[in-house]
Curated annotation (Swiss-Prot):
<feature type="zinc finger region">
    <location>
        <begin position="6"/>
        <end position="26"/>
    </location>
</feature>
<keyword id="KW-0426">Late protein</keyword>
<comment type="function">
    <text>Acts with RNA polymerase to initiate transcription from late gene promoters.</text>
</comment>
<dbReference type="InterPro" id="IPR014900">
    <property type="entry name" value="VLTF-3_Zn_ribbon"/>
</dbReference>
<comment type="subunit">
    <text>Interacts with the late transcription elongation factor VLTF-4/OPG110. Interacts with the late transcription factors VLTF-1/OPG093.</text>
</comment>
<dbReference type="GO" id="GO:0046782">
    <property type="term" value="P:regulation of viral transcription"/>
</dbReference>
<keyword id="KW-0805">Transcription regulation</keyword>
<keyword id="KW-0804">Transcription</keyword>
<protein>
    <recommendedName>
        <fullName>Viral late gene transcription factor 3</fullName>
    </recommendedName>
</protein>
<keyword id="KW-0010">Activator</keyword>
<keyword id="KW-0479">Metal-binding</keyword>
<keyword id="KW-0862">Zinc</keyword>
<dbReference type="Pfam" id="PF04947">
    <property type="entry name" value="Pox_VLTF3"/>
</dbReference>
<dbReference type="Pfam" id="PF08792">
    <property type="entry name" value="A2L_zn_ribbon"/>
</dbReference>
<keyword id="KW-0863">Zinc-finger</keyword>
<dbReference type="InterPro" id="IPR007031">
    <property type="entry name" value="Poxvirus_VLTF3"/>
</dbReference>
<dbReference type="GO" id="GO:0008270">
    <property type="term" value="F:zinc ion binding"/>
</dbReference>
Length: 224
């Protein structure tokens, strides 16, 4: 998928759907015809807008440098390696820090990225790959799962891993292990769906050959 230039924000962020186009950067929607669109298309549009916000956040430094320094001091005091920093550790730190009002997974991802001092591989080509896989995932969840909501931190970590954007943004596990296993099951079913779709339609990997490699994911522990 090639992202075209948006006439509004002048970024290469135009994604085409049947009957309309939208920009993942400035959220502009451009109607191509008067046909009423399916609700699912606009559902995907909203999800991609949120994805845009996540990608922008990961490439920014909105978190105060004082907060990062404080976290690094705690790590040094307790001899905690950057390799051991995950979403659970950062979330616990944020909950104990009264100076931070908004504690969401985007902030957690940003802090992990800064603490590990990692340069994310988010070139235009990589962004295209992430957007394409995420779009198929949203459609799959919409058609095959009871809930239309998506655990962004869980699935973006999976997508970032297979696209080699980063392996460091590990999501926070939840106390409900059934929910963790359910997300893993959805991901594995999505990969199986994409492999099956490839065989049926003879589409050449959607430009993402790695999506169809069996050994890239582990077996889900949820019995069905």
């Amino acid at each position: 998928m090639n992202l075209r230039l948006c006439s509004g924000c002048r970024h290469n962020g135009i994604v085409s759907e049947q009957g309309y186009e939208y920009c993942i950067f400035c959220e502009s929607v451009f109607q191509k015809c008067t046909k009423v669109q399916k609700k699912s298309n606009f559902h995907v549009s909203n999800k991609l807008i949120h994805l845009r916000n996540v990608l922008r956040r990961l490439l920014s430094h909105q978190c105060s440098g004082e907060i990062i320094s404080e976290l690094l001091d705690i790590m040094e005091k307790n001899q905690i390696s950057t390799d051991d920093v995950d979403a659970n550790f950062v979330s616990s730190f944020l909950k104990a820090n009264e100076r931070i009002n908004k504690k969401d997974y985007k902030l957690v991802f940003e802090i992990i990225n800064q603490v590990k001092d990692e340069k994310l591989n988010l070139s235009t080509e990589k962004i295209n790959e992430v957007v394409e896989i995420f779009k198929h995932l949203v459609f799959f969840c919409q058609e095959n799962t009871p809930s239309k909501t998506i655990n962004y931190s869980f699935f973006l970590d999976k997508i970032f891993d297979i696209t080699s954007v980063t392996k460091n943004l590990k999501p926070q596990t939840v106390k409900n292990y059934t929910k963790n296993n359910s997300n893993q099951l959805v991901w594995e079913n999505f990969l199986a769906h994409m492999r099956s779709k490839k065989r049926v339609t003879m589409v050449e990997d959607y430009g993402h050959e790695y999506v169809f490699v069996d050994e890239r994911f582990s077996t889900c522990s949820l019995e069905v």
